[in-house]
Every structure is written in C-alpha cells, then in structure tokens.
Amino acid sequence: MESGHRFDAQTLHSFIQAVFRQMGSEEQEAKLVADHLIAANLAGHDSHGIGMIPSYVRSWSQGHLQINHHAKTVKEAGAAVTLDGDRAFGQVAAHEAMALGIEKAHQHGIAAVALHNSHHIGRIGYWAEQCAAAGFVSIHFVSVVGIPMVAPFHGRDSRFGTNPFCVVFPRKDNFPLLLDYATSAIAFGKTRVAWHKGVPVPPGCLIDVNGVPTTNPAVMQESPLGSLLTFAEHKGYALAAMCEILGGALSGGKTTHQETLQTSPDAILNCMTTIIINPELFGAPDCNAQTEAFAEWVKASPHDDDKPILLPGEWEVNTRRERQKQGIPLDAGSWQAICDAARQIGMPEETLQAFCQQLAS
C-alpha cells in the first residue's frame, strides 16, 4: 500500500473489527474497539487510532491485555463509584465506566467515576464526547501506570507517563467545547507516527538518553530510549503530577515508581478519575447564551483571515468532516505493521488480501 493512501472509514472499520474477532474478541468488544480507533483517526488523532493495533496484539500475546473482560465494581456510594478495569480493553472498560457515570449523573446531577487497572483507554476526548452527547460536562484526570516516558521539569530522564487531561462542555445545537491533551509536549503515539513517516518532531518535545534536546522521534522508539518533555515546562509538569495522583492514586490504582515499573512498553495500563456534571444543576439560565457570546467574541479577532480562530474541539470537528469525505490517511509503515499484526494472530492471507483489495479501491 503506497504512502499517502486514504482509506474509506467504513471499510477500514470492518477490517479492524475482523482483526479483533480473529484475536478472539466477542463481537461487541471488537465493535467497541474498532469504533474507538476509527473515531480517533477521523478526529485527526492518528496517534490513538488504528496504529495502536500492533501494540495491542503484542500486549495480548504477552499476557497483559485480557480480551472479553469487563469493568468490575469495587465500591459504590451514591453518586460515586470505583471500578477495576480488570486489564480489559480500555475501549470496553471506559465505555462501561462512562455509561455508569452518565446514569448516576442523571440520578444525582453529578457523578464521580474512578477506573483503575484498565488496558489503554485511548483518546480521552472520545469518553468526554460520550458525556457531552448526554448533555453533561465532564472532567477527566488520566495516568499511565509504570511506563515512564516523560521527564519532569528540570529532570534528566522519564519519571511518569503522558498523563492526559480532558474537559468537555456541551453546547445547544452546536459541537461541544473540548479540551483534550497529553501533559507531555506531544503524545507518545505522535513519535510513533513521525518515526514511521521518517520525519522529525517539533523542537522542545524530546531529549535523548543523555538529556540532550533532539527532534529525532527514534529516541522514543529505539533503545536507548530518551524522554518526552512536558508542555509549558513547569506548568505541564504540575498538571501531569496532579493527573498522576487524581487519576492513579485516588482511583484506587497505582502511581509510577520503582515498584510499579512495567517490563513491556506495550503493557499500557490506565487509571482515570472522571467528574460528570449536569449543567442544569447550577440553575444558570443564561449559560448557553453566555457561552455563545464568548465564542463569537473570541473568533471575531483573527490575525489572518486565512487562519481562522478555532474553538477548543473545532479542529477535530473540521478534520472529522474532511476525513469522512476523503478517507483516513495512513502511511505505508503503519499499514505494514497492522498487516503484520493481523498475520501474527492468524488472519488467513486470503482474508487479509481481500480486505487490502477493498481498501485500495
């Protein structure tokens, strides 16, 4: 498959679902995982899309990822619930966690959901969008257990994960305002994408094993490994630390330290503490009008008419619209890695080639 090819999202979804069915996932699990990965690519976040499949296959083959498992309730107290993800697909455990949180927010006006010991939960904005679709605000603190990739401010090596932070605010008859980013300068997955493409990452994102700044993504993909830096120096570091504590420790999970280090970079275990709020709880009748007035005010001052000011989440909306029409782009290296993973789990070559023909058409 040549570099720069674009894939039809629906056909690609069928292929990805078939890959996980081949791995042994039940139909609903395979669908939930494919839904999430394709949605990440459509939103423009290829780092959290189908390029994760080889890592998931390795994690499963190493005994870390547990297929056909579900989130288990550890403690429930009114509007709060703690869940053990049981190393299930994060796309399953987080879906179940958000569904339960939304149900509690309907009942109580507010809910707190603590999820620990889940396999990789992917793009956090997806779970925020699930809450926004129900009409709720949500705030998410996420940690990555035992796979340090990010150096603290003034640090010389990795001490914690990319620890995403996410907030969503639903709007009436419009797309939700969505803040969703890793607390590292760039997501780890973006170094994988750059590495496959053979392109550098922006300055200020990486240091090598000796602590020297670099733009070469190979330092995060090949031994000896370097480190990501936090965004905005001390500010990103402080937010990452709070995500580690609120996402990891408060959820009943673990934080990253000597005793919790993982032996495999594919054993991606996430913890997430989520606050879900019904905006009607506050009795603010002008909330939507004030939100729209602010949005119009901000967007009315572009420096360059060819570069409009975007609201939080608007870039994803635009990218989704474009990719739904033109297809999902995928570089040759990522596609080859996905095909190799499909072969590794036993997908017959004729089945793989049949999908390749459909995707190439």
Swiss-Prot record:
Documented EC number(s): 1.1.1.-, 1.1.1.237
NAD is among the record's keywords: yes
GO CC term (a single one): cytosol
Keyword check for NAD: yes
Keywords, alphabetical: NAD, NADP, Oxidoreductase
Coiled-coil segments: none
Lineage: superkingdom: Bacteria
Reaction(s) this enzyme catalyzes, per UniProt: 2-hydroxyglutarate + NADP(+) = 2-oxoglutarate + NADPH + H(+); 2-hydroxyglutarate + NAD(+) = 2-oxoglutarate + NADH + H(+); 3-phenyllactate + NADP(+) = 3-phenylpyruvate + NADPH + H(+); 3-phenyllactate + NAD(+) = 3-phenylpyruvate + NADH + H(+)
GO molecular function: (R)-4-hydroxyphenyllactate dehydrogenase (NADP+) activity; hydroxyphenylpyruvate reductase activity
Binding of NAD(+), residues: 48, 122-124, 178-182, 234, 270, 313-316
Family (UniProt): Belongs to the LDH2/MDH2 oxidoreductase family.
Functional summary from the UniProt entry: Catalyzes the NAD(P)H-dependent reduction of 2-oxoglutarate, phenylpyruvate and (4-hydroxyphenyl)pyruvate, leading to the respective 2-hydroxycarboxylate in vitro. Shows a preference for NADPH over NADH as a redox partner. Do not catalyze the reverse reactions.
PANTHER family (UniProt xref): MALATE DEHYDROGENASE, OXIDOREDUCTASE-RELATED
Protein's UniProt name: Hydroxycarboxylate dehydrogenase B
Organism of derivation: Escherichia coli (strain K12)
